[in-house]
Amino acid sequence: MQGSVTEFLKPRLVDIEQVSSTHAKVTLEPLERGFGHTLGNALRRILLSSMPGCAVTEVEIDGVLHEYSTKEGVQEDILEILLNLKGLAVRVQGKDEVILTLNKSGIGPVTAADITHDGDVEIVKPQHVICHLTDENASISMRIKVRRGRGYVPASTRIHSEEDERPIGRLLVDACYSPVERIAYNVEAARVEQRTDLDKLVIEMETNGTIDPEEAIRRAATILAEQLEAFVDLRDVRQPEVKEEKPEFDPILLRPVDDLELTVRSANCLKAEAIHYIGDLVQRTEVELLKTPNLGKKSLTEIKDVLASRGLSLGMRLENWPPASIADE
């Protein structure tokens, strides 16, 4: 194998084995000896702790005041229902918080498919069981709050901060935002030409279905790369502040009057007076414009309205006008 002894091998993605929609194996090789465990452990920790996702954070169940109670006609107690709701896999588009509702009556299981939601929400596993109703006259109604977050946030950390505004009957749930349910990696031997001391990294992962396993690994690698950027050049710990030069004139003043989309009559009158830029126009007064041949009060009103819509007006004073970029034209 050619190359300097100080050069590192760059791994390539060898294979992605999609066991199911939520289960995949990803293989990368070749890696320098020891890098299999270095990268595998780093990616594993990020995948478990830093993947954003959605989770149930609060629940209100009709007739239930606290989590240590039971509900007539429901097989499970309230704690078990809350535990089942923690396993709800939800994908939310464009929102950080949504409220879902569930209303069910009659004997039978209550599943995620019974939840009512809008088009921004997708229930990934509609067959997920929440509880069982055991009586024909039994019913259950609940409001479920789902939030977007990262990592694991126990309900105990939110109890005191929300105590004053949390009404009786609103039950807090431990929020497990991570869409990754299981992650493991294995390092095997790899060979390139005459070198037999290399690593092969095999990552096996299962998700709750709200994220594709391949996309999850891609995001984790991006997070790791971004966190390591600061170590690339330690001399640049403090970035110099770049002072933005404030332009001498508002860019809109440097645009031609044609950009105002005036009527043909008004535009021709302005060009006849050598008014080519918006900066030229705003310095004129109403009296000056009314002296322009063929420009009447109707055209003047049009010009004033168009300028006002852009935060400008007639009679403005512009120091050092025109700028050199225009004066040289």
UniProtKB/Swiss-Prot annotation:
Keywords: DNA-directed RNA polymerase, Nucleotidyltransferase, Transcription, Transferase. Its EC number is 2.7.7.6. The keyword Nucleotidyltransferase applies. One of its GO terms (biological process) is DNA-templated transcription. It is an enzyme of class 2 (transferase). The keyword Transferase applies. SMART domains: RPOLD. Residues 249-329 are annotated as: Alpha C-terminal domain (alpha-CTD). One of its GO terms (cellular component) is DNA-directed RNA polymerase complex. It catalyses: RNA(n) + a ribonucleoside 5'-triphosphate = RNA(n+1) + diphosphate. InterPro entries: DNA-dir_RNA_pol_insert, DNA-dir_RNA_pol_RpoA/D/Rpb3, DNA-dir_RpoA, RBP11-like, RNAP_asu_C, RNApol_insert_sf. Residues 1-235 are annotated as: Alpha N-terminal domain (alpha-NTD). GO terms for molecular function: DNA binding; DNA-directed RNA polymerase activity; protein dimerization activity. It comes from the Bacteria. It holds the Pfam family RNA_pol_A_CTD. The N-terminal domain is essential for RNAP assembly and basal transcription, whereas the C-terminal domain is involved in interaction with transcriptional regulators and with upstream promoter elements. Belongs to the RNA polymerase alpha chain family. Homodimer. The RNAP catalytic core consists of 2 alpha, 1 beta, 1 beta' and 1 omega subunit. When a sigma factor is associated with the core the holoenzyme is formed, which can initiate transcription. DNA-dependent RNA polymerase catalyzes the transcription of DNA into RNA using the four ribonucleoside triphosphates as substrates. This is DNA-directed RNA polymerase subunit alpha. It comes from Shigella dysenteriae serotype 1 (strain Sd197).
